[in-house]
Amino acid sequence: MSSTVIDRARPAGHRAPHRGSGFTGTLGLLRLYLRRDRVSLPLWVLLLSVPLATVYIASVETVYPDRSARAAAAAAIMASPAQRALYGPVYNDSLGAVGIWKAGMFHTLIAVAVILTVIRHTRADEESGRAELIDSTVVGRYANLTGALLLSFGASIATGAIGALGLLATDVAPAGSVAFGVALAASGMVFTAVAAVAAQLSPSARFTRAVAFAVLGTAFALRAIGDAGSGTLSWCSPLGWSLQVRPYAGERWWVLLLSLATAAVLTVLAYRLRAGRDVGAGLIAERPGAGTAGPMLSEPFGLAWRLNRGSLLLWTVGLCLYGLVMGSVVHGIGDQLGDNTAVRDIVTRMGGTGALEQAFLALAFTMIGMVAAAFAVSLTLRLHQEETGLRAETLLAGAVSRTHWLASHLAMALAGSAVATLISGVAAGLAYGMTVGDVGGKLPTVVGTAAVQLPAVWLLSAVTVGLFGLAPRFTPVAWGVLVGFIALYLLGSLAGFPQMLLNLEPFAHIPRVGGGDFTAVPLLWLLAIDAALITLGAMAFRRRDVRC
């Protein structure tokens, strides 16, 4: 039997797409990412660079006008394990060293920024199907990853360069200015690579963010514990390496090699892992689901719990560890600061009034509250992700009402952030109480200090719900609102912003616990604003179309 082979000629002018190398299309994707981030990218680059000279150095020149005042401040800082745990050590009494001491937190903030940026353009795009659509064009296997890396590496370098240039324009040593800028850029590059590796592990962007932030939280804890003690553990943390460069204190340039080598190794690992998986897949395989849904999944609240329980566990553990660190180092801070009234005034002003230990606890839990607010925003944004991922439409087409569906995710956000915050308060209270031998006396005060943060934490969830109902396309702007609040808190008083602007920051209205003059009025106002925004967002969601 003979067979006929039909050779179908291609239509004239038709060519099969030629992908070229694995990096084909990288520059085009980079331009796309720059366009998508044309607001957020310049914002965080400038926020993490410009204040170094205009706020930190300028404020130290005003508060500590001579070397003797700076020497007293530096001695007080180094005598306080709590201060070293929060911001790192200060290595001498020069204007540069004392001036950038609190900017040590910028190494953590740039890590947060690059993690969110990399995951937004890699795993989040794959999860939404955008990456698959792009890959249907002439784009190489590694173009997406390379574009995201170039974007974050470039932004990190720009942040360090702008910060260094600003410092060079002041009266501090040029070598220290360059060292701080390079160290800041190196921190961003390390965690850019961390996020790139995490993006290869799971099909879920939420899991990817959880892994990357778990690494960052571990790095921060190691750095904080190390700097509060002998300093040995700080060498196990990339955040510690950046501080060990010691700008303005006999710069140790060789330490930068640790960060650059780590970034290089992790970047190579990310490419190797990317080569071994398909678009949309992860190296950690998802467990197959059960044949039938359990009773919990038959209603929206159970589904919301199932979707978010992993995030709740990770964030709670992270805040609990931070609470343990803060609770264990707070005792004796008043004695350790000695008679330096300037430093006492700064710590008291940023944390409230009264005893310095209570003021430091208020400061520490304000930081915890801001982290919990980020967790609340993350959980509330699940509404937006479910809608844009077309999963909400399926649920709402059945017997589930819009109000019930929204309430399930909102309840998870409010309860989850409350649980994480209160457990961190319990951990800090136990550590503090055992240190002073008075658990029964200290635990209620510390837990109360944690609890009063909740109305401000919930405000960020309320803002997210309001945006989701009224302007769903702009729901992720809730992250920008949180960044604005944090910037006002960290920079507002130092930069001399008007009080009217400072009053917009919700954490500035948290009353002090344990001093005898507690007032609940600010908390009631915050709760009223929370309720109003949530009601407004829910009513708007009931009346608008579900986005497809």
Curated annotation (Swiss-Prot):
Record keywords, A-Z: Antibiotic resistance, Cell inner membrane, Cell membrane, Membrane, Transmembrane, Transmembrane helix
Membrane-spanning residues: 39-59, 99-119, 148-168, 178-198, 210-230, 253-273, 313-333, 359-379, 410-430, 450-470, 477-497, 521-541
Induction details: Transcriptionally regulated by RaaS (Rv1219c). Expression increases in multidrug-resistant clinical strains (MDR-TB) compared to drug-susceptible strains.
Gene Ontology annotations for the cellular component aspect, listed alphabetically: plasma membrane
Subcellular location, record wording: Cell inner membrane
Topology within the bilayer: Multi-pass membrane protein
Domain of life: Bacteria
GO biological process terms, semicolon-separated: response to antibiotic
Statement: the UniProt record of this protein carries the keyword Membrane: yes
Its job: Probably part of the ABC transporter complex Rv1217c-Rv1218c involved in the resistance to a wide range of structurally unrelated drugs. Probably responsible for the translocation of the substrate across the membrane.
Complexes and interactors: The complex is probably composed of two ATP-binding proteins (Rv1218c) and a transmembrane protein (Rv1217c).
Name the record gives this protein: Multidrug efflux system permease protein Rv1217c
Source organism of this protein record: Mycobacterium tuberculosis (strain ATCC 25618 / H37Rv)
